[in-house]
Structure formats: C-alpha cells, structure tokens
C-alpha cells in the first residue's frame, strides 16, 4: 500500500508500542490507547498522560483525546455549573447530615515471636 499507518500516530501494529517509549509511537497530545482484552492503567510516559496497556498480540489503536481546556462540558453538567444550588457548602466544609465516623480502637502491640 505504501502508506505508513504510524505516520499520524493513530494506528500501530508494533508489539512493543504499548509502552509508548519510542519517538515513532509517542504522539504530541494526550493519549487513550485501546487494546482488545487488555486492562488499562493510568500512567505518565515521557510527560504525556494517557492509558498504558498490558502487552497484547492484537494491534494497538492510539487515539488522541481532547485536553481538558478544549473539551466541551458533558450534557447536563452545564446545568450544574450554570445554576449553583443554595445548599452547596464551601470547599472543605462538612455537611451536618453526614454520619459520624466510627471510633478508633487501639490494638495491643504484638511482641517479637520467640
């Protein structure tokens, strides 16, 4: 076909690119990598926040995700931010309706086994 699928940083069949460590596979923007059947773990690689996946035999699809500054609010969240409620408490304040915390019980220290 002649075209290199990794040229745009969107698709790669390299079995080791899950680590996103080489310059060929390191996109400029934030990442979301998706591999069939692999569990995603949040991580920071070379200053890029994204999802790092466990190695897999299946191809790895890397899709840039919008940065928080540019992403629009989810439907419904704009209503929450547009109409602050009267009962909202300042940051760090406790709500009187919250249940009390359980008492802490000190356990006796165990001595070294003989």
UniProtKB/Swiss-Prot annotation:
Keyword Phosphoprotein recorded: yes
Pfam families for this protein: HEV_ORF1
Region of interest: Interaction with the capsid protein: 48-72
GO cellular component, one term: membrane
Keyword field contains GTP-binding: no
Region of interest: Interaction with host SRC, HCK, FYN, PIK3R3 and GRB2: 95-104
Annotated segments matching region Disordered: 85-114
One GO MF term: identical protein binding
Domain of life of the source: Viruses
Modified residues (Phosphoserine): 71
Record keywords, A-Z: Host cell membrane, Host cytoplasm, Host cytoskeleton, Host endoplasmic reticulum, Host membrane, Host-virus interaction, Inhibition of host innate immune response by virus, Lipoprotein, Membrane, Phosphoprotein, Viral immunoevasion, Virion
Single Gene Ontology BP annotation: symbiont-mediated suppression of host innate immune response
Sequence segments annotated as region (Interaction with host HPX): 28-68
Subcellular location(s) of the protein: Host endoplasmic reticulum membrane; Host cytoplasm, Host cytoskeleton; Virion; Host cell membrane
Annotated stretches, region: Homodimerization, and interaction with host AMBP/bikunin: 72-114
Post-translational modification summary for this protein: Palmitoylated in the N-terminus.
Note in the entry: The viral particles present in feces and bile are non-enveloped, while those in circulating blood and culture supernatants are covered with a cellular membrane (quasi-enveloped).
Domain notes: The PSAP motif is necessary for the release of membrane-wrapped virions from infected cells.
Record's subunit section: Forms homooligomers. Interacts with host SRC, HCK, FYN, PIK3R3 and GRB2 (via SH3 domain); binding does not activate the kinases. Interacts with host AMBP/bikunin and AMBP/alpha-1-microglobulin peptides. Interacts with host HPX/hemopexin. Interacts (when phosphorylated) with capsid protein ORF2. Interacts with host TSG101; this interaction plays a role in viral release from the host cell. Interacts with host SIRPA; this interaction down-regulates the phosphorylation of host IRF3.
Function comment: Small multifunctional phosphoprotein involved in virion morphogenesis, egress and counteracting host innate immunity. Plays critical roles in the final steps of viral release by interacting with host TSG101, a member of the vacuolar protein-sorting pathway and using other cellular host proteins involved in vesicle formation pathway. Also acts as a viroporin and forms ion conductive pores allowing viral particle release. Impairs the generation of type I interferon by down-regulating host TLR3 and TLR7 as well as their downstream signaling pathways.
Name of the protein in its database record: Protein ORF3
